[in-house]
């Protein structure tokens, strides 16, 4: 077993620094042709609230430079459609915590796109004694994690769509179906191709590793150290046929020790330290069911600036995202 680094032979490297190399230019040319020929889709994972941003609203409604995260991603999709006359289906995965507000937002904001919504399941939150935490007339719940996409997406029509680019809502620099990525995915006939950036020390991202096959270890579960280790930015392309195959496969559950609000006799309690466990499934645990999957390094400064924290943190906050947008997003989205 070994973590994937910049020196790994099985890492796809279409960039030298921030510029495309010969392989990258080849992939881009292939991808541009395929964007004109194929019906592709994008899934935006939007089940989370902006709790760490001091808001109970869906994270996708948070604004960077006067535009919501949703708006930044919709603009990217519209640019692709305009530039390549691309046929792109748009899907948004919500949760019971975000569904109503997200749908209401898109009803009041016309992006000129046909968007389908589907909702992931919840899981019970349990206390340290293993019993479900009380929540008024029921039990406390939380979204079941991005791994529930394989079950939840069966709610929508995927007919004719060959591949789906799955991204997290919080990365304001996410390149959706960019030609380099699409070209690399089709060139080597992957079931899944994932993007990576070189991981920074103590950065809270999962790490890619090779253990008979490619895997990701979530940041809370890995001990990745060393130079050039590749971090997960939650930007994957899947064959639609693979996603359909995963429908009846149960992914492993991961427990996270969290501060979970609960009630006692109808009175709301907001704990100041972790008091229970949330159960999640992770999308990357599907990797073990692939025939072929791969990872492609991309430049962090152009493709990864997640909004994860409020201003009480010095990283991944509204200011760092604003700076990233000003430097790299406003200039051009598609290259």
From Swiss-Prot:
Principal location class: cytoplasm
Gene Ontology cellular-component annotations: cytoplasm
Pathway involvement of the protein, from the record: Nucleotide-sugar biosynthesis; UDP-N-acetyl-alpha-D-glucosamine biosynthesis; UDP-N-acetyl-alpha-D-glucosamine from N-acetyl-alpha-D-glucosamine 1-phosphate: step 1/1
Subcellular localization, as worded in the UniProt entry: Cytoplasm
Gene Ontology terms: biological process: UDP-N-acetylglucosamine biosynthetic process
InterPro entries linked to this entry: Nucleotide-diphossugar_trans, UDP-sugar_pyrophosphorylase, UDPGP_fam
Gene3D superfamilies assigned: Spore Coat Polysaccharide Biosynthesis Protein SpsA, Chain A
Binding site for substrate: 146, 308
Catalytic activity: N-acetyl-alpha-D-glucosamine 1-phosphate + UTP + H(+) = UDP-N-acetyl-alpha-D-glucosamine + diphosphate
Keyword annotations of the record: Cytoplasm, Nucleotidyltransferase, Transferase
Coiled-coil zones: none
Molecular function per GO: UDP-N-acetylglucosamine diphosphorylase activity
Enzyme Commission code: 2.7.7.23
UniProt motif Substrate binding: location: 45-48, 218-219
Binding residues for UTP: 45-48, 59, 120, 145, 170, 278
UniProt cross-references to Pfam families, sorted A to Z: UDPGP
Family in the record: Belongs to the UDPGP type 1 family.
Name the record gives this protein: Probable UDP-N-acetylglucosamine pyrophosphorylase
Species of provenance: Encephalitozoon cuniculi (strain GB-M1)
Gene (name only): UAP1
